[in-house]
């Protein structure tokens, strides 16, 4: 199975470089934003 880091690099890093979000700057990968947007669990992602 692929590691989380390799999956992130392949599928997410283009838009979430440095934990930010180039599409919607208010939805970063900070824990506070993940919780506010209901994306703070593995199953939610």
UniProtKB/Swiss-Prot annotation:
GO terms for biological process: photosynthesis. Its main location: other. Keywords: Electron transport, Heme, Iron, Metal-binding, Photosynthesis, Thylakoid, Transport. Binds 1 heme c group covalently per subunit. Gene3D superfamilies: Cytochrome c-like domain (1.10.760.10). Coiled coil: none annotated. SUPFAM superfamilies: Cytochrome c. It is found in: Cellular thylakoid lumen. GO terms for cellular component: plasma membrane-derived thylakoid lumen. Monomer. This is Cytochrome c6. It comes from Prochlorothrix hollandica. The lineage of its organism: Bacteria, Bacillati, Cyanobacteriota, Cyanophyceae, Prochlorotrichales.
